[in-house]
Each structure stands twice: as C-alpha cells, then as structure tokens.
Amino acid sequence: IWHRGAVDADGKSGDGAGIQIEIATDFFKEKIISSGQTPDETKRICVGMVFLPRTDYAGQEKCREIIESVLLEENYHIYGWRQVPFNSKVLGKTAEQSRPEIAQVMFKKNENLKTNDLERDLFETRKKIEKLARENQLKNFYICSFSSRSIVYKGMFLAEMLAEFYPDLNDQKLTSRFAIFHQRYSTNTFPSWDLAQPFRTLAHNG
C-alpha cells in the first residue's frame, strides 16, 4: 500500500507509518530481566511507548518524573525504562530534525484486575499523566500506547522502512496474534511523529 502514503521532497520522510501489535510477553520479560528486575509471573506486563523531547533534557527528565510519580500513585510497580533501538539512517532530513527520544516504560499493577478493568485503569492513569504534562507546559511529549494488551511502533518514515527503523520488529521473540498497519496521507494537518498512525485504539483514513 505504499502508493497510499505521501513522501516529502527529501524522498525519505513520510507522512507517517506504524503498526499496532500485541505485547509480546517473552520479549518484554527478557528486557525486564536484563534491566535487573524479575517479572511477576502472576501479573500482566504493561508497556508505555512514549515520545519524549529529544533536545530538551530537563523537559525529558520532567516527563519521566511525571510518568513515574503517577504510576506509583496509582499503585503500579515500575520495572524500568528502556531506550528503544532505532536506525536513523532510514530517515529523511525532515523526519530526523523532528525525531523525538523514543522510550518504553515497563510496569505492572500491584493489585489483581481483570484485563478490561486493567485497561480502563491504564486509560485513566494515562490521562492523568497527560494532564500533568500540559500543566507543566511540556512540549514534544506524546504517549503512543499505554497498555497491557498492545503496543504501537510508529514514526515519520516510509512504510517499507518501519522494520528497518525499529529493529525490535525483526526480533523473533516479538510475536503477535494480530497486527494493525497504517500509512498516512496527510491532508489538512502537517505531518508529525505523533500524528503518525495507528493511534492507541484506532487507525483510519478519514
């Protein structure tokens, strides 16, 4: 479906492409263990995929601080942060200039909740984080996904470069029973990393 997406004059920056997949338990267990923690086998692993301000280090730290404080306040245990590997060579000049810092926060709910109840709790927790980020006037902060079910990998690159930009997507442990792919053709809004799709719960073409 490459013909459905737009390309910048630099020939590499796309209007946005991405994929939503299931959270691969084995993959993230390995990442949690490598961070020095032991995953709780009785709890679902939750992952937040976030875009942080790349050049504003104070703002970046404040974003992490807000996420962590709200998670602890809402009775979550934080396993740790992971800097998401990427290959910037596939990006065009426009996409590289606006590229955010890309990170994942891995955590669990301390209490036992059914999956739907946990997802609702995660939704409310994310909204609190976003509200605090706005109140602190933090720029270039965006939560791509915040769930125990699914995760979104996306950005301002050509659709065929998705797995080249994110090496995670080539890892055999990153398995999923579903995949929602999207390539964007921007019409009335200027392309940006956060507007690439899929969004957290949908993908559409208007």
Please tell me what each predicted stretch does.
Residues 1-205:
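N-terminal segments that mediate ammonia production and transfer
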